[in-house]
């Protein structure tokens, strides 16, 4: 940190990487003049695991279990972008039923992610009650996930060409019951939090970002929409079946921490609307494009017919990526999650570049906290919503 300390009474404080309010192994080197923040330098990389390099040494099917360790609170989105990239590259068609199932899972995952943002955010501000409330609803979402995927987290459910399994009997009725119950829960959150005078004192006008600044910094997700920019990839660049549903982009114009809170609460309501429509309209048919599993090459003369039929029904380990490049993106809970994929006519990607929304959104933190009070750092950092597994990759 290049900072010439002329005043003797300035203090340099390390926040993290083990501090509970850091939401992961993030370290902040903060320069203070009393309670006023003079400078802040984030130190990243404590959770770096080389995810991009690992992708270059694995086939897509082998790599799928790794991606759930990026944003481990919204794993459906990391799975979605991982299978979308080769699907777009090879022009693989997805059955309509599989696309609807994906939308349902993605929106449930969005709600779970926003819930686990809301609880710790309120705990950072000193309110413990919402932290326990959010686990009540989040547990119900994980029960729904477990019934379909067998896992509460790290689901490994998406596949190239569809999903791993169909929805079990009676699951959609349980999902609709959850939607009705959860809408009441959102009302309870708003009554408890939104008009609370202590909460408003802590968040109103804190961490202001103008619309122009948000665009120039490359922010996305609630960080961008809370500054008056109505940019949501589900509307702007629709993927899966999002153009089949009626819902509204949530945005605010104030650009402060309160606006980011309101955007996320509003998004949970809209996610429920999307889920209800998807469950009501979901078509019949297959849940996976079996053609995507077949071998591209001709039958090996050394195999007998039984071996070929048996091997051909499994997810093919020799799914080769053609010599092309493309960028795909989805609207994750924290912003635009993208993959830049370069194929090379081989099993492994030649380049697998991840665009993590949390990493880019975090870059504006030093600007936001300067000239603020020390206690406001937790408010501003919490309003950004970062997961260090995604930031460090």
Curated annotation (Swiss-Prot):
GO terms for molecular function: NAD binding; oxidoreductase activity, acting on NAD(P)H, quinone or similar compound as acceptor; quinone binding. SUPFAM superfamilies: HydB/Nqo4-like. Its main location: plastid. It is found in: Plastid, Chloroplast thylakoid membrane. Gene3D superfamilies: Cytochrome-c3 Hydrogenase, chain B (1.10.645.10). PROSITE patterns: COMPLEX1_49K. It comes from the Eukaryota. GO terms for biological process: photosynthesis, light reaction. Coiled coil: none annotated. One of its GO terms (cellular component) is chloroplast thylakoid membrane. It is a peripheral membrane protein. InterPro entries: NADH_Q_OxRdtase_suD (IPR001135), NADH_UbQ_OxRdtase_49kDa_CS (IPR014029), NDH1_su_D/H (IPR022885), NiFe-Hase_large (IPR029014). Keywords: Chloroplast, Membrane, NAD, NADP, Plastid, Plastoquinone, Quinone, Thylakoid, Translocase, Transport. It catalyses: a plastoquinone + NADH + (n+1) H(+)(in) = a plastoquinol + NAD(+) + n H(+)(out); a plastoquinone + NADPH + (n+1) H(+)(in) = a plastoquinol + NADP(+) + n H(+)(out). It is an enzyme of class 7 (translocase). Its EC number is 7.1.1.-. Pfam families: Complex1_49kDa (PF00346). Belongs to the complex I 49 kDa subunit family. HAMAP family: NDH1_NuoD. NDH is composed of at least 16 different subunits, 5 of which are encoded in the nucleus. NDH shuttles electrons from NAD(P)H:plastoquinone, via FMN and iron-sulfur (Fe-S) centers, to quinones in the photosynthetic chain and possibly in a chloroplast respiratory chain. The immediate electron acceptor for the enzyme in this species is believed to be plastoquinone. Couples the redox reaction to proton translocation, and thus conserves the redox energy in a proton gradient. This is NAD(P)H-quinone oxidoreductase subunit H, chloroplastic. It comes from Zea mays (Maize). The lineage of its organism: Eukaryota, Viridiplantae, Streptophyta, Embryophyta, Tracheophyta.
